[in-house]
Amino acid sequence: SFGLCRLRRGFCARGRCRFPSIPIGRCSRFVQCCRRVW
């Protein structure tokens, strides 16, 4: 969910996570939770 993604210091990205971020979960069905690698 959006809140959980925020707690894990991630952000919601539609479709795919773009470099330099990696997927760490989901915000919704078509939205991934991403986190920057650096």
UniProtKB/Swiss-Prot annotation:
The lineage of its organism: Eukaryota, Metazoa, Chordata, Craniata, Vertebrata. InterPro entries: Defensin_beta-like. Keywords: Antibiotic, Antimicrobial, Defensin, Disulfide bond, Fungicide, Secreted. The keyword Membrane does not apply. GO terms for cellular component: extracellular region. This is Spheniscin-2. It is found in: Secreted. Has antifungal activity and antibacterial activity against Gram-positive and Gram-negative bacteria. Involved in the process of food preservation in the stomach during the incubation fast. May also be present during infection. Belongs to the beta-defensin family. Disulfide bonds join 5-33, 12-27, 17-34. GO terms for biological process: defense response to bacterium; defense response to fungus; killing of cells of another organism. Monomer. Its main location: secreted. Secreted into the stomach cavity.
